[in-house]
A protein has these predicted regions:
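Structural recognition of the beta-strand scaffold that forms the well-ordered cores
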Residues: 47-51, 74-78, 99-102, 147-153, ...
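Bacterial N-terminal signal peptides
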Residues: 9-21
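Acidic (Asp/Glu)-rich catalytic clusters
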Residues: 64-71, 83-105, 142, 173-174, ...
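Catalytic domains of cell-wall/extracellular-matrix polysaccharide-remodeling enzymes
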Residues: 62, 84-85, 109-213, 245
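A short alpha/beta connector and helix-capping loop motif
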Residues: 59-80, 279-282
């Protein structure tokens, strides 16, 4: 009798183990099929956008010539006050075909940062943040004749208020822009599931080319979209994207063997949105 119970017990264990194994294989298969269900254009394996924040002078003074030489289009997330300092240069950026996105009017961040102590998100409400977005759009249009379709969260921070009064302003961004971009996030974007209103941004200031290349190669393996985020463009240093590393990155991304679609945040976000609409068209109204 004991032997029979033992055999029954072993049999049940084996059955459960096999079911779990099959389930795991099925889950892995579904995951693989899911990854294959999204297609980047022209057989590309991943996508990359180069973006730069704050309308820093070096972006115009050093960046435009570099991008013109490389034949690369990037996204500049600007504040009107920064644009005003190099207005002719920013008009040239638009003429060169670069995207200009909104980076708020006055760059509010947490008051824990000394530079934003008097412009702290903790002291904002949603109405104040809405004005930041709308007024910046108006000023950018006056300056450059373009209406931004994308937004970058200052400091990558997405909340206003304190304690029980904290509110996310992601919905404000979603209602006004095609896409919103974060900063210092831990992953590239999965085009199947990412929330375009808070797409992940990957910092590449202070990195050398090999570090940048690894980020790209990882994205290629997973079919993802990397949105690089930089600030100054020049010699390697704090919050500076090194020009030599940037040139090498552009060359690598343009190489057909790399398998990457290099374009602006707006263009890639538009493609993702269209793919989703084509895959899941809205139900027709009766």
């Amino acid at each position: 009798m004991k032997a029979l119970r033992l055999r029954v017990g072993i049999g049940m264990f084996c059955a459960v183990f096999m079911c779990a194994q099959v389930s795991g294989q099925s889950s892995s298969l579904q995951k693989g099929e899911k990854l294959k269900s999204f297609r980047w254009p022209d057989g590309k394996k991943a996508a990359v956008s180069l973006s730069f924040d704050d309308a820093r002078l070096s972006q115009v003074d050093n960046g435009l010539a570099l991008f013109r030489k490389e034949g690369v289009k990037v996204t500049f997330f600007v504040q009107p006050s920064g644009v005003e300092k190099r207005l002719a240069g920013w008009k040239q950026a638009v003429a060169d075909g670069h995207e200009v996105g909104n980076h708020s009017l006055t760059h509010p961040c947490t008051g824990n940062y000394e530079f934003s102590r008097h412009n702290a998100l903790e002291n904002y409400d949603l109405a104040m943040m809405a004005r930041q977005l709308d007024e910046a759009n108006k000023e950018i249009y006056k300056q450059l004749g373009v209406k931004p379709r994308t937004f970058a969260y200052p400091c990558g921070q997405k909340f206003v208020g304190r304690g029980t009064e904290v509110r996310s302003y992601v919905p404000l961004v979603a209602n006004r822009f095609l896409a919103g971009r974060g900063y210092l996030d831990e992953s590239a974007n999965d085009p199947l599931v990412c929330d375009l209103a808070q797409a992940m941004g990957t910092g590449f200031d202070d990195l050398d080319f090999l570090q940048m290349k690894k980020i790209v190669d990882d994205a290629v393996q997973e079919g993802r979209w990397v949105i690089f985020v930089g600030h100054e463009i020049g010699e390697r240093g704090y919050q500076t994207t090194d020009t030599q590393a940037l040139e090498a990155l552009c060359e690598y991304l343009k190489n057909p063997a790399t398998g990457v679609w290099l374009s602006t945040v707006e263009e890639i976000a538009s493609y993702i949105q269209k793919q989703r609409e084509d895959t899941n068209p809205p139900a027709s109204k009766k």
